[in-house]
Amino acid sequence: SGLLNLAAQIDKNGNTLVLDGGDSLQGTPLVQYYLAHADEFPHHPVAEAFNAMGCDYFTLGNHDFNFGYDALRAYLCAMDGVCLCANVQDLGGALPLLPETVHTLKNGLRIGITGIVTDYVNVWEQPQNLKKLRITEAFDAARAACARLRPICDICVCIYHGGFEEDLHTGAVLSGSGENLACRIARELDFDLLLTGHQHMPVESVRIGGTFAVQPPANAGRYLQVEAAVRDGGAEFSARLLPVGGIHREQPYRRLLPLEQAVQRWLDEPVGHLEQAIPPEEKLCAALHGSAVAALFNQVQLSHTGADISCTSLGNEPAGLAASVTMRA
């Protein structure tokens, strides 16, 4: 619903670009259900929403690889916008993606854009999902794309599905793993604008070196409106984090309604029963005293897999379970 509501707020003109930073195929029951029943529904829900808002360019996030090559191809082919990802090599030859592009606005400004995904995809992703893909080193790909774009554009933009490796207030290094490289990209490469993601951390604006950087929070609850101007001294930027709101247009909502109704029925299907409900657990309380929800999940995983040790990851929001457990929980 966040993407559909966002689409209702966008009023494009010839000097507007709509960009997205990836991780669109994971994290919602709607997409999970759709990917398991794609042959029953003619419209890809995520692509429909992005197309409704006029998404021009986007890059891939690490979670967009979770469902394999064919699911990724179906998503990219359903999108009207162009996928830019300079460090993804398509060995299968069926993905419509480019390393970078130059978009000329109505006012004549040339916007050079590239996309990069954290190369930690190689660490996290199941090997079978990457058989037809090669994810190369993110910084090297960004550097090469910037070098190609810089001489032929007025504003150079990197859509980076990765985050900041430093504390933005103190400069303290938070991680040297290479998962997040936004600060290094901003300092060492000649991008004017760095659109980051991955960390789910709202950053309305920060200047690192000569680069203006931003990051929207997760789940399409808010979006970033960035305004740019080119003057004699170079590109100048301002940005605002804005709420998505609760209004959507009739289409593509009506086209997607049969899928939404099927998802709601699926979410209400019973999966088990507890002797008593587990109330929502605050993060600090769970960290100090343990989590009944995590304990239950781990016991189920141990029982069904025969493993010796089980770990589970809980969501960002405190959650509990009703006595009658459904897919909705």
Question: Where are the model-predicted features located?
Answer:
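Short, surface-exposed linear segments at secondary-structure transitions and domain or protein termini
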Residues: 247-253
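Acidic, metal/ion-coordinating pockets
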Residues: 1-246, 258, 288-300
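Non-catalytic terminal accessory segments
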Residues: 1, 11-13, 151, 254-329
